[in-house]
Amino acid sequence: MARHILIIVLISVLTALNSFSQVVRPDERLRQIVSQNGQAEVTIPYTDRQSIDLLTVNVSILSVKNKIVYVSLSPLTVEWFILQKYEYQIVEKIETRGLVSASNLSQAMNWDKYPTYFQYDSLMQSFSKLYPSLCRLDTIGTSVNGKLVLALKISGNPLIDGDKPAVFYTSTMHGDETGGFIMMLHLADYLLKNYSASSRVKTLVDNLAIWINPLANPDGTYGTGNTISSPTRYNANGYDLNRNFPDPFTPNTVKQKETLDMMKFMRKHNFVLSANFHSGEEVVNYPWDRWLSKFHADDSWFNSISRAYADTAHVYAGPAYMNFLDNGVTRGAVWYIVYGGRQDFMTWELHGREVTIEIDDQYVTPAAQLTLLWQNNWHSLLGYLENALYGIHGLVRDVSTHNPVPAKVFINGYDKDSSQVYSDTLTGSFVRFLSPGLWNLTFSAKGYRPVTMSNINVTSRLETDLIVDMSPYTNKVEAPGYETSLLLYPNPAHDDIRAIPPDGLTGKVNVRIINSTGMLMSDYIAEVVHGIPIIIDIKMLPSGTYTIVFTGIVTRTSFHGRFVVIK
């Protein structure tokens, strides 16, 4: 009897051990999901702000709500996450449904099905062919896998650049956030078809250069195939493109091809206003994303245009739509901090004005809901573009020749943290969005005396026109030494300045900072990457005027400029 009991016990133990060996541990299962799907979503408890700010440096946070942090992991980040030993729950992937592909181009143009990649390419080409006087197709670049990243320019004269304020709508830089992709195609179709029928559309198209990039991450959306089946957030190399832009806090991030192409495109076109469309929540998110303690100089203006987008959506979709956080609006860092985001790059580095608009609380919008998504948003889309018609629209020119002058436009006592704007190098035109009130603008340019225009009246929903005539210095002694070919900003500065590296300055460079008496204050070697601003720490410098010299180690070519430190 005892022997039988022993045998039964042994069998039970062996069975239990065998069952245990077949149970996949959570970490291993997480690895398997990432390996199979290219990504995984997990949740962790919200503990404190400092912990979340550390987390966002290393992984992609999707959202923070109800004391829960939603995190996306890729093949590049899953091992780091596991090593941190977070207490986490895997979010079970709901099988993607409703990704109905159009059977032909005509069906795709009903905007209630997803096009194949080849149909998308054909759609973009068809717009420019059907409306050559209003539309031009351009290529921003190619993805890692060679798919085209395309953009349409819709304007009264699409072949000429620089004659009108440029605005930019872009979507789906996260490949599994698909609703904005179709919404942007639908918007392009709507603008072109209604140019002659709608005075509102005609005003926008005649007075703006409207650029639309429906799909910023085609590899994430289509993978290596032709249809959308298992879209992922990341590009083909596993990078989150909305954490990949230059950021002083994450300087070593490997810039992806899609990011470098987009940076070049945005620098070229000098967009005054832009919006970046996402999914996952329903909210308009405005700068800053990376600083909780800093407010953009135009914070109230940003809040007002974001509020207008959400409130307009409420009128046409009802109060249940776009009501996340502050009834559909948030300052980015209040929600959670993002490093390397496109919104802050556009606003800080390029002096533009960009918001991030989350249009669906589902990542993948089912095809059956694409029409509803359009109905919820198209009035807001037009209203947001109309913001570019307001504010101060100016022209900076030489007082004698009337040639355009590239100048810095600065508001003393107001502008900060790179909020100033610059007049266009080729046309001298600029746009400065401001809240209603009286404003004093100061213009400074190489070789010209500064000009201050006082009591410029900005009225809500109206354009204020301004012509600024600048007088050149009559001799070099009189000029304050703006011989630099470097763009330094912010200038004056407090903690750090940035320099846009000119052509010919790449690789290792010698950086020297010299004070006004000729004393060498700093001398070191830095690595310069073309297109990425050089960040110079000036915290240890006392107030004063300084010259900075960059000399290529290999080429021995030097570039220099002057900046002012104010403590």
Give short role names for the model-derived ranges.
Residues I392-S400, G428, V468:
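A short, amphipathic beta-strand motif
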Residues T365, T371-G391, E463-I467, P472, ...:
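Beta-strand-rich domain onsets/edges
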Residues K446-S471, V564-K567:
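Structured interaction patches on ligand/partner-binding surfaces of diverse proteins
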Residues P480-Y489, A493-K567:
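C-terminal outer-membrane/trafficking sorting elements
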Residues I7-A16:
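Bacterial N-terminal signal peptides
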Residues G428, P436-G447:
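A short, solvent-exposed beta-strand micro-motif common in secreted/extracellular proteins
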Residues D161-R307, D311, V315-M322, M346-W348, ...:
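Active-site/substrate-binding loop(s) of hydrolase catalytic cores
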Residues N403-V405, I411-S435:
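Short, acidic Ser/Thr/Gly-rich low-complexity loop/linker segments typical of extracellular
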